[in-house]
Each structure stands twice: as structure tokens, then as C-alpha cells.
Amino acid sequence: MKKVSFILGALVSVSGCTTDDLNADDVELSTSSSELGLRWLPNNLPIVNTLGFSETFSTEGRVELRNEFFDEFGTNDRTCGSCHKVTEGWTISAAHTRLLFELTRGRDPLFRTNDGTNSPNADVSTLSARRSAYSMLLSRGTIRVGIGMPANANFELVSVDDPYNFASAAELSMFRRPLPAANLTAIPTVMWDGRVTGATINDALKDQANGATQGHAAAPNPLNDVTRQQIVDFETGLFNAQAYTWGIGFLDANGAGGRAETLAAQNVEFTTVIPTRDARRWNLFDSWQNSTDPDRRAVYRGQELFNTRPHVNDANGNPRPEFTCTNCHTVQNFGTDLAGRFFNIIDTPTVALRRSPDQPLYTFRYTGPPITNAGGVVTTPTGATIQITDPGRALITGQWRDMGRFKVPSIRGLAARAPYFHDGSANTLLDIVKAYETFQGFVFTPEEEADLVAFLSAL
């Protein structure tokens, strides 16, 4: 058998053939850093993406590739690095996933039935069957997460519409993007729904490493504490950001504060008290306010829209000046939330309209007492129902109020890791902006949309 190894950050061109023309018995593709002979990568090595290139800075002095993060502890050939790739902003992109599928005929360790297929019972016996079975992973870069209905919840599951006839109250199927394994010094909560907790974030990350190894990698035994800590030490030393954007140049030019190393120098202290508007103001590109380069001025204008533009938020549709992008993205220049809050940014009644054909749709009924607002008006009567593709935090707390709520993720290094949101439903940075206009009441002109995209692409 011939073994072909390559670096996924390289440009690959395939002309006139597909994997249907290849004999899988003759060629096995390897993306393992060990088999490539790479022991480490230098800090700030440029990794090309569609908008420029990103970089990773490690506090170890270089990005090690021979450690527990890249070791196999399970039974399905996976490592932490299977879903958290240095070339993809320490997660996976949908584009990368599709390329990997074509090059390996869907046999790379990323493609496993325990969480990669739309149902764990999916047929993966042929190439065409695998292409169908892994459709959510291929189209949205999402992994299937199975969670059962919580005990003593104040809601009940009324019905399940699952195209693959698997999801039930015992195990609902949710499809979520892997979160980046970098910039972790700025996260107060672990996992999209916060289900992994600990006395400290370090403890929570250790439990997450073990849970992922036993779940995603199908390890028969728990990781020992030393191994867990070694994985966490590696992760928490990684900082990832866009370094260079086409047409703009290096993102620390002329006094700007972009790039990864500036994140490593930033001290983040978590608090339940939301910082003042000035304290959470992003300032990466202040020096470009009066730049002679129009593209750099656009990045600055996008930053200021992010800092200052309010959205319609009260019952009368009036702008509330304190409700800007930084009201949720409170960690300055990282974009996470200092208080570890969970938000539903998509109007719940419209979730069904945004559903992928391969996603299950759930109908839930509220069984608790009527919920009223501060004025005593009933906002949620007993018996209210909703349809939703992912209940989010509600499956952890059992509380109706947490339906569709998710943590606030870091928004650095976005260019390397499309698609966006927890379910991969936004394909581009402009799609993100449009979603906030639709569901959160932001109002931007086309020029302002372009400025925001310029800003997000520079993060």
C-alpha cells in the first residue's frame, strides 16, 4: 500500500478526477504530524486561508506537535488534533472537511459513526453512503452531540422530526461546531452549553479533555490526571489570530494591535460584574483611524461599529445605547464574555425556518407556571410550545428560559474557520452581520456591513 502524506495548509488542486477514480486499497492518506516527521512548528508560521493568513503563538516558544494532544488514546484512531487542527484555527472548517473526505474517500479518523454521521446507525459501507451519512459534517463542519432529556425539566418533548429516525428523549441529536482549542485563557465556560464544569477553568478543561477522549475518540479508559493536565497546559498556551489580510497587509502595521502574540500578553480576569462600555471597548485598530490606506480605515470603522452601534432591544423598539456587540462580547479584543453568560441570538420561532434538511426538529412544551415580565405581563403561558433544532443550555439546566441559549465564543481567527455560529449556519462573515440585523435588530447600511466584515476578517 502506498501512503501519501501532506500538509493540509498547502494548496491542493484536483483536475479531471474525483475520489471515485481512486482505488482506496492502493492509497492511504495520512495527515498525522508524526508520520510527516514534524515535531513542531515555529511560532507565527503563516497558515493560508481565503482572506489572508493566520498564525498561532505558543507560550512554549514553538507549537509542539508531538505531545498528548496529538496522541491516540482511543479505539478509532482519533486524537484531539483530529477535530482541532492548527491549519483551521484549531477547529475544523467545512471546506477542509470536504477536501479531507474526497482525498480519503471518507475514511480519515474524522469520519466516524459515533459522532460524525447524522445518525450513529448510518450506513457507511460505500462511498456514496458515506457522502450521505456525513452530510452535516461536510456541509456545516458540525459534530453530532447526543444528550438526553434532563430529569425534572420544566418542559417536555412533544415530538421529534428526525430524517434519520434516531433522535428520541433518551438521546437527542444536536449538531455543533467544534470550538477552537486556542485562546482559552479568555473562556469562563467550557463547551457551547456549559455542561462541563469544575472548581476552576483548568479543572473544567481537564474534564473536557477526558470526556472528549472517551466520547469522540472512544477511549475505553479515562485519562490519568497527569495526561489531562499536559493536554490543558498545551491548549492554554496557544493563541490564534489572523496575521495578514489580503489588501490590508499585516494586522500590526502602523501601531495596530492585531495578530496572535498580543493575545498572549493580555491578562483576563473573570467577573460576574459586566465591565463598563469603555472597559470592554475594542482598540486593536485605533491607530488606523486616519490611515492613508482606505482598507485600513474600513477596518477601524468596523471596529467602531462593533463598539458603539446599538440594536433595537426594548419592548417599544427603541435603541438602547448600552446594547452593542460588546454587551455580549465583553472580553476586550478576545470576544468572549467575562461573566460566562448564555444567550439566544436567534429568534426561537424562526429556528425551524433555518433548519438544514438533515437536522432533527424538536417540539417542546412548557410545563411550568406562567412566566411574567417585570410589568407582570405573562410572556410564556403554561403549555406554550416551540420548535427548535438545538435546545442548547436548556438540556443542561432543565429550564425553559435556557432554550436555544449558548455561550459566547471567542471571535478571533474567524477567517480560518468558517462556517459560523454553534450550528455552522452562517457560511460567511457577511452572513453573520446579516443574521444580527435580522434577529437582533441591528441596522447597517451596505457600506457599514462591508466595514464590519473588514473588521471581522482582521481578527
Predicted segments, located by residue:
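Sec-dependent signal peptide recognition
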Residues: 2-9
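Enrichment for repetitive, rod-forming helical segments
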Residues: 9-10, 336
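N-terminal type II signal-anchor transmembrane helix
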Residues: 10, 20-21
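Periplasmic c-type cytochrome electron-transfer domains
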Residues: 25-459
